[in-house]
C-alpha cells in the first residue's frame, strides 16, 4: 500500500515537475534502436481479425484458460517445512539424515499448554486426576508416540515434590510454573499432511471437556488454524475486492457490463496461473529443472499471488478500457472503439508486461520454495493476461456484447 501510494504521489507531483523542467532535453542521449520509430498497426489489425469471428476465437481461448486453471481444484496447502528448501542444501540433508537414523529424537512434537486460573495451585491431585483421563485419551489417538508428564499421574501428588522420581521432578520443575504447564505430545506425523491435521483436531476434541484451559500449539496446529482462518476470511475479502473493483471501473466508464467483464477476465488470468503452479510445484512438472521437491503449496502463495496479479491485471485493464471508452465516446462504434483502444494501449501494455515478466522470472531461481512459486505464478499470470486475455478474450467478448457494453442503468442513459 505504501509503495503504491508513494508511486502515485511521485507521478502526480515530482514527475510532472521534472518533465516540465527538462522539456525537450528529456530526449537527449537516446539509444538508437532499429525500427523504434516505425509505426505499426499490429494491435488494430489483430483485434479486427478477432472481432470478425469472435465466437471462433473466444471459445478456444476460454477453454484453454479454464483448462489451465482446472488443476487448482486439486490444490493442497501447507504451512511449509524443510521440504521448502532445495534438496542439495546442507541443512536440509542433515535434518533428513537425523530423521532417518534417529526417528525418536526428531519426532514431531505437539505442545499442550495448560493455563491455570489466578491463584490456582497447579500442584493438585484433582487437576492431575482430570489430566490423567485426558492424557489417556490422547495416547489412544492414531499417530501419537508418547505423552509423559507428571501432571498426568495423580498418584505422585500424595507425596511431596522432593520425594518424586528424578525424571518426574525435573520435568515438573522445567515445564510447570505458577500459571501454566506444558506437555509435549510426540507424534509420527510431520506437518503439512492430512494425518497431522486430523491428529490436531482429535487432540482438541479430547481437551474440549476439561475444566482447565488447554491450548494446542505447534506448527501443525498453526497450519490448521491458518487454513481455517483463510477459509473464513477469503469469501469476505474476495467479495470486497471484486465489488470495489467493479464500482471503480463503473465510475470510469459508466457501464454495468464492462466492469463485470473486466473482473471476470482478470479472474481467468489469475486462475490460469493458479492451475499451473499446482502442476509445476505440487505435481512436480519442473522439479528437476528448478531444483525443488514436489509438495503442497505454501498457505500464503494463493492470497499473495491473487492480490498482486489481480492488481496488475486491473491496471492493464483500466488502461485499455480508458482508451476504448474514449474511442467509443468519439465514434459511437463499438467495434471501431475496441480496435482503436487496443491499438492505442497495446504496445504500452505489452512493454509493461514484458518488464514484469522479466522481474518475476528472476524469483524462479530462488532457493526458497515460496519465493520460487510466487515468482512463477506472477510471471504466468502477467503473460496470460497480456496475451490470451487482452488480445483475444477481451475484443471478442466486447464484439459479441456490442452496444450493450456501454449500457448504464442511470435512467437508461448511454455510457
Give the positions of each predicted feature:
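Membrane-embedded transmembrane helical bundles of large multi-pass transporters/channels
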Residues: 1-79, 209-415
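Structured non-transmembrane domains adjacent to transmembrane bundles in polytopic membrane proteins
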Residues: 74, 79-287, 370
Amino acid at each position: 500500500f505504501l509503495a503504491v501510494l508513494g508511486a502515485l504521489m511521485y507521478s502526480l507531483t515530482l514527475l510532472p515537475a521534472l518533465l516540465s523542467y527538462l522539456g525537450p532535453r528529456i530526449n537527449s542521449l537516446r539509444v538508437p534502436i532499429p525500427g523504434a520509430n516505425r509505426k505499426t498497426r499490429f494491435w488494430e489489425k489483430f483485434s479486427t481479425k478477432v472481432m470478425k469471428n469472435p465466437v471462433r476465437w473466444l471459445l478456444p481461448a476460454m477453454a484453454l484458460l479454464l483448462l489451465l486453471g482446472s488443476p487448482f481444484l486439486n490444490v493442497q496447502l501447507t504451512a511449509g517445512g524443510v521440504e521448502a528448501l532445495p534438496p542439495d542444501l546442507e541443512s536440509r540433508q542433515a535434518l533428513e539424515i537425523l530423521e532417518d537414523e534417529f526417528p525418536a529424537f526428531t519426532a514431531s512434537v505437539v505442545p499442550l499448554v495448560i493455563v491455570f486460573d489466578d491463584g490456582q495451585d497447579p500442584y493438585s491431585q484433582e487437576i492431575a486426576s482430570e489430566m490423567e483421563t485426558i492424557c489417556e485419551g490422547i495416547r489412544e489417538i492414531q499417530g501419537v508416540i508418547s505423552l509423559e508428564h507428571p501432571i498426568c499421574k495423580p498418584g505422585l501428588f500424595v507425596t511431596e515434590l522432593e520425594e518424586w522420581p528424578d525424571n518426574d521432578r525435573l520435568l515438573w520443575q522445567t515445564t510447570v510454573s505458577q500459571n501454566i504447564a506444558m506437555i509435549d505430545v510426540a507424534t509420527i506425523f510431520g506437518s503439512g499432511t492430512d494425518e497431522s491435521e486430523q491428529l490436531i483436531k482429535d487432540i482438541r476434541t479430547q481437551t474440549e471437556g476439561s475444566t482447565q484451559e488447554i491450548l494446542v500449539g505447534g506448527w501443525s496446529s498453526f497450519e490448521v488454524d491458518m487454513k481455517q482462518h483463510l477459509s473464513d476470511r477469503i469469501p469476505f475479502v474476495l467479495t470486497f475486492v471484486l465489488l470495489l473493483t467493479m464500482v471503480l471501473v463503473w465510475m470510469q466508464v459508466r457501464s454495468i457490463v464492462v466492469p463485470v467483464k473486466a473482473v471476470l477476465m482478470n479472474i481467468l488470468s489469475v486462475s490460469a496461473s493458479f492451475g499451473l503452479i499446482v502442476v509445476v510445484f505440487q505435481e512436480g512438472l519442473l522439479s528437476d529443472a528448478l531444483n525443488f521437491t514436489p509438495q503442497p503449496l505454501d498457505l500464503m502463495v494463493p492470497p499473495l499471488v491473487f492480490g498482486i496479479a489481480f492488481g496488475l491485471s486491473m491496471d492493464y485493464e483500466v488502461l485499455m478500457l480508458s482508451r476504448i471508452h474514449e474511442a467509443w465516446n468519439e465514434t459511437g462504434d463499438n467495434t471501431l472503439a475496441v480496435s482503436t483502444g487496443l491499438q492505442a494501449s497495446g504496445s504500452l501494455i505489452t512493454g509493461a508486461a514484458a518488464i514484469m515478466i522479466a522481474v518475476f522470472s528472476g524469483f524462479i531461481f530462488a532457493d526458497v520454495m515460496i519465493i520460487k512459486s510466487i515468482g512463477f505464478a506472477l510471471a504466468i499470470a502477467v503473460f496470460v493476461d497480456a496475451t490470451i486475455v487482452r488480445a483475444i478474450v477481451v475484443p471478442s467478448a466486447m464484439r459479441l456484447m456490442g452496444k450493450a457494453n456501454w449500457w448504464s442503468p442511470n435512467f437508461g442513459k448511454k455510457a
